Amino acid sequence: MLQGKNAMKPIAADRRTLASLTNSKLNKSQQEAAKIILENTDRVMGLQGYAGTGKTYMLQEVEKIAHYKGYNLTGLAPTGKAVRALKDANIKARTLASFLMQYDGVAAGRGTDKGRFDMKQEYKRRLLVVDESSMIATRDMQKFLTIADQLNIRVL
């Protein structure tokens, strides 16, 4: 994970774009979290908060700004229920298991240079949002982070 430190360009760092957060319905804590996500240059970020504090709601605002800047958010979650919650918030989502199955060859070190290049291009301007990460088995999280590292994927 250290090699992912300062490895990415920020999604949005200009004052004008970030000022739109103050005009949103987000509270101050949500605005600050959104600003950190949008300005961050690390490949892997963490977001922690109690249930019902508006993390997913805040991500809707992040998604709007990211989309405006040419980025997409994709949610990954360990359960179908968590995937549905992300989709209900208008965040494209799928199960982590389906993602791991699709990119199993990357985690195992198989594949061609062209295939890896194509996959990197697919995720070049995308933020993967992992919801309910505390429910993910350690082995699956390790596999996921290996894939994210190999494909240079930005993760929250």
Residue ranges: model-predicted function:
Residues 1-156:
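Conserved ATP-binding/catalytic motifs of P-loop helicase motor domains
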